[in-house]
Regions:
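Terminal accessory carbohydrate-recognition/targeting modules of carbohydrate-active enzymes
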Residues: 1-165
Length: 165
């Protein structure tokens, strides 16, 4: 069922926002960042969770080496969350949309970049993910496992990033 219902937020964007599917949840702030937050496990609630496993603390984009820091607006739909960035100096409007398909332990992220200059141009987009693989039990120190440093690599053939603890 398609819904045209949406909420736009322009103030108090430090408030939490959740993008959820049946197998994963992405928790961050309405400004598009992933601050340390959480009560059950202090400072560890934010990020991407797939079931009981925390996959990452957050992710970040940059356009032509200019980071997308705090969004100017948050657009909340029943099935997705979008963050609007006005890059005045670069004359760009960027929208980062994210949703979690049901049954998938991951997140789909889409960037829409609107060029506000009269002439066409190319931009370079970079993506950074901060992994923090753990279980809730491990974060509490209840499963006897020691939290280690995550190791990640990009597989060119699969065109995918893989990480492990």
């Amino acid at each position: 069922m398609r819904s045209d219902y949406r909420v736009y937020r322009y103030e108090h964007l430090e408030a939490p926002v959740v993008t959820a599917g049946s197998a994963a949840v992405l928790i961050g702030a309405q400004n598009g960042l992933f601050p340390d937050m959480g009560y059950t496990v202090s400072g560890e609630m934010g990020g991407l969770w797939a079931g009981e496993r925390k996959v990452c603390d957050g992710f970040f984009f940059a356009i032509d080496d200019v980071p997308l820091t705090q969004a100017d607006a948050c657009e909340i739909h029943p099935a997705l969350t979008a963050f609007h960035y006005r890059m005045q100096k670069e004359q760009l409007h960027v929208v980062r949309s994210q949703f979690i398909p049901d049954g998938v332990g991951g997140c789909v992220i889409e960037l829409t970049i609107e060029n506000l200059r009269p002439a066409p141009r190319m931009v370079e987009v970079s993506y950074t993910v901060r992994t923090d693989i753990m279980t809730v039990a491990a974060a509490h120190g209840e499963d006897g496992m020691e939290l280690g440093r995550d190791v990640g690599e990009y597989d060119e053939k699969e065109q995918a990033f893989f990480a492990r603890d």
